[in-house]
Structure formats: C-alpha cells, structure tokens
C-alpha cells in the first residue's frame, strides 16, 4: 500500500515593509527583496530573465529585474522598501527607479559597497 505524499502548503505571508538589496556588478544585476529579519521574500536577476552575455550588464536589464522582483513582492502585500545598493555596476540607479515605478514606496537608499582598506591585490589592468 503506497502512502500518500503530503505536500506542505505554501503559507501566504503578509509583509508590509522590507529591504531591497540591489547587487550590481559589471556583468549582472541581482535584486533580492527580504523582510526586516533578512529572510528572502522575492528575487530576480538579469540573467534569470533571459538576458545573456553583455546584455545582462545594461541598465535596462537591471530595470526589468527590479520590476520582476517588485511584482512578486507586492503579491504578499509589501508596500515600502528600504534600498541597499552594493557594487559598481551600471544598473544601480535604474533598478531603484524601477522599484519606485512598480509601486513600492522607497523609504531610504543606502550604499553598502565594500571598500577595501588596501586589502588584496587587484587584478591586472586590461589591455584592449
């Protein structure tokens, strides 16, 4: 007699405010929306949306990633976000604008890009 497999039902969360972490590198932009404790609620990236190669690093790809993450965060009734931006990429500003345009109220913007106090040696200069 085969036992029935019970699936865990997904509990519908109701989170009013959260934190939008935008990680913008030279190659990609990742947008992750978490609750106040840091548990991931929604995420998206330029690569996950189907952008490949150098198109991932464009501001338009970052805008689309932020819109997708905001849309799935608004499904659980999220209204306000505090934005933290990390990295030197080109999609920083467009991702913040896309979050606001999607209907999320941006309460604060914080730059948390790590700056070394003369840490490890950087990679050699590119000769193109």
From Swiss-Prot:
Gene3D superfamilies per the UniProt record, alphabetical: Ribosomal protein S11
Protein name: Small ribosomal subunit protein uS11
UniProt GO molecular function: rRNA binding; structural constituent of ribosome
Pfam families hit by this protein: Ribosomal_S11 (PF00411)
Subunit structure, interactors included: Part of the 30S ribosomal subunit. Interacts with proteins S7 and S18. Binds to IF-3.
Stored PROSITE patterns: RIBOSOMAL_S11 (PS00054)
Lineage: Bacteria, Bacillati, Bacillota, Bacilli, Lactobacillales
UniProt-listed InterPro entries: Ribosomal_uS11, Ribosomal_uS11_bac-type, Ribosomal_uS11_CS, Ribosomal_uS11_sf
Domain of life the protein comes from: Bacteria
GO cellular component: ribonucleoprotein complex; ribosome
Similarity-based family: Belongs to the universal ribosomal protein uS11 family.
GO biological process: translation
Summary of the function given for this chain in its UniProt record: Located on the platform of the 30S subunit, it bridges several disparate RNA helices of the 16S rRNA. Forms part of the Shine-Dalgarno cleft in the 70S ribosome.
The entry's keywords: Ribonucleoprotein, Ribosomal protein, RNA-binding, rRNA-binding
